[in-house]
């Protein structure tokens, strides 16, 4: 799942990611190893969620959350609250496509909170929330793609 996600969003780059998930003292521990092969063919390896920074860190965080919720006994629900600020606008459509594939393959739902119209347009169902004097008003967007 981790490598498939990275390849879907960064198809032109050679990126590998492995995760060792274990339980230590009643807490989940994750060791992430990221490998990137540069244009010169040199492989660089780093440990940690923030290895190589920016959009790569954002996507690794998403994939890690998905991996963890798939271990749950409940129907998986992934909540994403403005989770992709570092993802370049040229990659947002790839990200949305990948999220749809995840939902189908893993039989899960995603609740995505965003101000990014490109992400909102990819939704199957959308709501616009606006403040009123009586509190928040939820307006159903029947077809977010329009």
How does the language model describe each region?
Residues 11, 52, 68-73, 101-106, ...:
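Conserved catalytic network of the ASCE P-loop NTPase/AAA+ motor domain
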Residues 36, 53-78:
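GG-anchored amphipathic helix commonly corresponding to the ABC/SMC/Rad50 NBD signature/C-loop
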Residues 6, 62, 113:
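Conserved RecA-like P-loop NTPase ATPase core
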Residues 2, 55-58, 62, 91, ...:
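Helical mechanochemical/support elements of P-loop NTPase systems and associated helical scaffolds
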Residues 81-83:
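Walker B catalytic acidic pair
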Residues 94-146:
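C-terminal lobe/lid and adjacent interdomain/linker elements of RecA-like ASCE P-loop ATPase modules
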Residues 1-51:
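Extended helical coiled-coil dimerization/tether regions that scaffold
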């Amino acid at each position: 799942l981790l490598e498939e996600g990275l390849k879907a969003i960064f198809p032109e780059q050679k990126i590998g990611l492995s995760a060792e998930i274990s339980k230590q003292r009643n807490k989940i521990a994750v060791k992430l190893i990221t490998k990137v092969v540069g244009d010169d063919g040199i492989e660089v390896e780093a440990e940690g969620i923030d290895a190589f920074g920016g959009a790569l860190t954002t996507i690794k965080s998403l994939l890690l959350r998905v991996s963890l919720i798939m271990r749950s006994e409940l129907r998986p629900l992934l909540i994403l609250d403005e989770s992709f600020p570092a993802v370049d606008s040229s990659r947002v459509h790839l990200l949305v496509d990948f999220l749809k594939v995840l939902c189908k393959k893993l039989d899960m739902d995603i609740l995505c909170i965003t101000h990014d119209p490109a992400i909102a347009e990819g939704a199957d169902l959308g709501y616009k929330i606006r403040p009123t004097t009586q509190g928040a008003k939820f307006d159903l967007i029947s077809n977010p793609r329009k």
